[in-house]
Each structure stands twice: as C-alpha cells, then as structure tokens.
Amino acid sequence: MTIIANQGSHLVPMERLLGIILSLLLVFACSSLSANQQDWELVSDRNDIQVYMKHRDESRLKTFRGVTRFTLKDEYALAALLNDYPSYPKWLHFVDSAEEFDRRGPLDRSLRFTTQLPWPLADREAVLQALVKQTMTADEQSVMIDLVNRPDALPPNNDYIRFPEMTGKLGFRRLGNDQVEMTYELILDPGGYIPAWIANILLRDAPYFTLERLRRMISKPEYQNHYYDYLDLHGPGRPQAAASLGDSQNHQNVTK
C-alpha cells in the first residue's frame, strides 16, 4: 500500500514528498556553508599580511582578521612579549597602555587596555579576560589567546568610553619547519560616536600594524631563551628535561 499526501488537488506519493524535503534541506545546507565561506572579504594584502573584513560597512559591530606567516624558532618569545605589558604600545595598534588587574592563576588574567584615538574622537578602554587554548595533537599544533569582554569588571572611568562589545584572539599554529601562521582577530562595537567609514579605516589598520610590529618585536634579544612551564612549546630556553603537558591542553592566558 502506497501512502500519499494531499497537495492541493494533487496526490503526491509520500516517498516523493520526503525526497523533495530532503533535497530542499540539502540545498539550504550547501547554501549556508557557501555563505559562511564567503563571509570573510580580503581588504588588504601587503608585506605578507592579509587583512579580512566580515561585516557591513554601516554595521556597529566591526570584525577584522589579520593573518601572516613567518619563521618562529623560539615560540616562547611570544609568551615573553605578552608578559611585557609596557611593550604593548610598541606593537599593539592604537593601544597606549596595558595593565593586569586580576589573576585567577598564571594562565587566567584580567587586563585593561586604553586606546588613544586621533582627534576629535574620544579615547576608548577595554576590560578583558585573556584565556589561552593550547592544542598539541597530530592534526593541529596551536596556541590561541581568546579575549573575552568583561566591561563590568571595573568601575566606569569618565576619561574613556568603554567598548560595550569586544572579543578577539591572537595566536599561532605550526606549519612545519619552524614556520607559523599568526592570526589576530577583533570583533567590537567601538561605542560612542564614530562615523562608520572612519571606524572601518581605523580598525582595518589594527590587524596589519599589530602583526607587522609583532613580527619584529618577538625577534628582539630580550624575548629570546625564555621558558614557561605551562606552555608546551619549542625554544632554546626549554630545558631538555621539561615534561610534556600532554597531547592536548586547554589553558587560560599565555602570560605569566
């Protein structure tokens, strides 16, 4: 006995109806995947640094990602640089100060950043929790710092407009032969009044200049030959007897 469904004045076999539904679902899924893959738009490609955008120009929420590849023989140099808060204005674009105001352990910290924007724009501040995820498996070897917005962790400061929304990440994955791919991503609402076109120009520059300066900073002598026992990385400062942290580690924050 064939089960049928009534479609207006026509009778459609249930098997055919199910086939139509499954086909529509498959088309929708493929369309969604294609849209997601096309969300990132390349807006700048210079000095081996690619900057991508993922938002409408008029949107309050701005999303930018910078990616670069380079040689990094001492991976602990990145941790050493991130430990050096006074150095942040030298490489983190628009940041003019960075401080740690709370710590739940050596791998979980709360940070405050202030930014100095060109006149007549008001200066901003960000209050963030910095967490790190370290993955060391056969398929992936990476360290990624996640920045989570915590705007209520400190009292308001009348000298700054606090970012109402902000998340980000900074880290690298190994490519082999001491090559790494470094990523810096920002998703934020700048708060207050900033014309959309100005915000787009300013924020588009942030990933580029941050990565360009970071590449130079981590090669400086003061950041070489360090070792942090909470990170399973490569570097000449790592003792030969240092134990591995395991095949896969999830930590919070790459500074100590």
Where do the model's predicted regions map?
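Compositionally biased non-globular segments, especially hydrophobic aliphatic-rich helices
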Residues: 5-8, 26, 32
